Amino acid sequence: MTAKKSLTIFDHVLVPEHRVLSKEETEELLKKYNIKPSQLPQIKTSDPAVQALDAKPGDIIEIKRKSPTAGVYYYYRIVVED
C-alpha cells in the first residue's frame, strides 16, 4: 500500500512563502514604518494562502518573495473579510 502525499498551495513553485506575524512582530512592523494597519495592502479571507494558514481578519501576513534581480524581499498584507 502506498501512502498519499498531501499537497498544499505552498508546494507550488510559483507560490511564495507566507506566514502570519505574531502580535509583537506586527507592532514592530507598524512602528518601523510608522503606519496603521489600514494603510497596508489587503488580502481576502478567501485567498487560498490565507485559508491554508488559517489566518483571521486583522492578521498581518508576511510574504517572502524571491527575485533574480532584487534578491529576497518581504511584502506585508492585512487579512480582510470578503
Swiss-Prot record:
The reaction(s) this protein catalyses: RNA(n) + a ribonucleoside 5'-triphosphate = RNA(n+1) + diphosphate
Q: Which PROSITE patterns match?
A: RNA_POL_H_23KD
Gene3D superfamilies named among the record's database cross-references? RPB5-like RNA polymerase subunit
Q: Name one GO molecular function term.
A: DNA binding
Tell me the enzyme class: transferase
Q: Its Enzyme Commission number?
A: 2.7.7.6
User: Which keywords does the record carry?
Assistant: Cytoplasm, DNA-directed RNA polymerase, Nucleotidyltransferase, Transcription, Transferase
Q: Which GO terms describe its biological process?
A: transcription by RNA polymerase II; transcription elongation by RNA polymerase I; tRNA transcription by RNA polymerase III
Q: Name one Pfam family in it.
A: RNA_pol_Rpb5_C
GO cellular component terms listed in the entry, alphabetical order: cytoplasm; DNA-directed RNA polymerase complex
Instruction: Please classify the protein's predominant subcellular localization into one broad category.
Output: cytoplasm
Under InterPro entries, the record lists:
Arch_Rpo5/euc_Rpb5, RNA_pol_subH/Rpb5_C, RNA_pol_subH/Rpb5_CS, RPB5-like_sf
Q: Where in the cell is it found?
A: Cytoplasm
* Chain's role: DNA-dependent RNA polymerase (RNAP) catalyzes the transcription of DNA into RNA using the four ribonucleoside triphosphates as substrates.
Question: Could you say which protein family the record assigns here?
Answer: Belongs to the archaeal Rpo5/eukaryotic RPB5 RNA polymerase subunit family.
Assembly and interaction partners: Part of the RNA polymerase complex.
- PANTHER family in the cross-refs: DNA-DIRECTED RNA POLYMERASES I, II, AND III SUBUNIT RPABC1
User: What name does the UniProt record give this protein?
Assistant: DNA-directed RNA polymerase subunit Rpo5
Q: Which organism is it from?
A: Thermococcus sibiricus (strain DSM 12597 / MM 739)
